[in-house]
């Protein structure tokens, strides 16, 4: 019995060795006679999406957007596909924001903690909002100057810590203490409140407000309005946008993006157009309202 088994094993070894030696040079038709019959069969429901194998960009956008305010919808999306907890979206002009970054700058610690539990990658901005004092302090000590880095939408590290006070009534005493320590520490540094931009008075803001067109299409233009923080913001016509920070006479930057500049053509205190420039394009949009 042992001899027979030995004979079978020897034949098996020889056969597989030959395939191993010559397999790379065998024609595809010969290789197909072996165990490759199942390759190429795809099981799916309906048509394969055009974006496959990437996740639908609209879903990614929704996860990031809803992470600002809608925990239940975020759960509905992320519970099914936990990798969405790592979602990142570019709003416009290089303004990148992750789902956890969204929850962090609006002070939604409940959403942030849920996303962390699903595999999201917290940053120093998240830890500042959560009041993780020792973590924030150790990161700044390890990389001095990191406190000056701006978060999504050009929001500062200190403002993230302030945002942590939003849910203070649902925090434990140790959590409240940690948040207070974090805020005090960042205030003491003196440079964690972000870039210093020129002030724009409410009266000055008014002259920039309105719609600007650069083409014949309905969406070929921008709307300048005030955002929730009472700052000038620029977005597609009729839609929300990013903050405009003043850097010079009738000159602004978009959400603090260093390579994006917005300037206005003003004559006799009347605005005629705006020009947006980045490293690749320059667009002139004329004021229509």
How should each PLM-predicted stretch be described?
Residues 82-83, 119-120, 144-145, 191:
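Ankyrin-repeat C-terminal turn/loop position
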Residues 52-65, 86-102, 121-128, 149-167:
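Ankyrin-repeat boundary/"N-cap" motif
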Residues 28-65, 69-70:
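C-terminal segment of N-terminal export signals and the immediately downstream linker at the start
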Residues 2-21:
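N-terminal secretory signal peptides and thylakoid transit peptides that target proteins
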Residues 40-44, 74, 78-82, 102-110:
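Repeat-mediated protein-protein interaction surfaces in helical alpha-solenoids
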Residues 115-125, 193-202:
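Short domain-boundary/entry signatures in modular proteins, especially
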Residues 193-289:
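Peripheral terminal and inter-domain segments
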Residues 70-78, 108-116, 132-140, 170-171, ...:
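Ankyrin repeat structural motif
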């Amino acid at each position: 019995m042992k001899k027979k088994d030995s004979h079978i094993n020897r034949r098996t070894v020889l056969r597989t060795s030959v395939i191993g030696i010559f397999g790379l040079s065998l024609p595809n038709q010969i290789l197909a006679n072996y165990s490759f019959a199942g390759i190429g069969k795809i099981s799916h429901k309906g048509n394969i999406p055009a974006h496959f194998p990437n996740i639908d960009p609209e879903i990614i956008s929704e996860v990031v957007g809803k992470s600002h305010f809608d925990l239940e919808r975020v759960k509905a999306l992320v519970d099914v596909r936990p990798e969405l907890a790592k979602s990142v979206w570019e709003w416009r002009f290089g303004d990148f924001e992750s789902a956890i970054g969204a929850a962090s700058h609006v002070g939604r610690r409940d959403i942030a903690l849920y996303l962390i539990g699903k595999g999201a990658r917290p940053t120093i901005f998240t830890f500042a909002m959560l009041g993780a004092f020792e973590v924030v302090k150790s990161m700044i000590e390890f990389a001095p100057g990191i406190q000056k880095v701006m978060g999504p939408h050009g929001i500062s590290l200190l403002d993230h810590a302030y945002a942590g006070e939003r849910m203070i009534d649902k925090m434990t005493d140790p959590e409240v203490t940690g948040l207070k320590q974090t805020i005090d520490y960042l205030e003491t540094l003196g440079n964690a409140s972000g870039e210093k931009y020129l002030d724009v008075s409410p009266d000055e803001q008014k002259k920039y407000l309105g719609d600007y067109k650069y083409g014949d299409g309905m969406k070929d233009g921008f709307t300048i309005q005030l955002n929730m923080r009472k700052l000038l913001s620029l977005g597609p016509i009729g839609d929300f946008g990013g903050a405009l920070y003043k850097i010079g006479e009738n000159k602004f930057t978009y959400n603090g993006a260093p390579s994006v500049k917005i300037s206005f053509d003003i004559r006799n205190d009347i605005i005629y157009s705006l020009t947006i420039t980045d490293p690749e394009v320059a667009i002139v949009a004329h004021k229509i309202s």
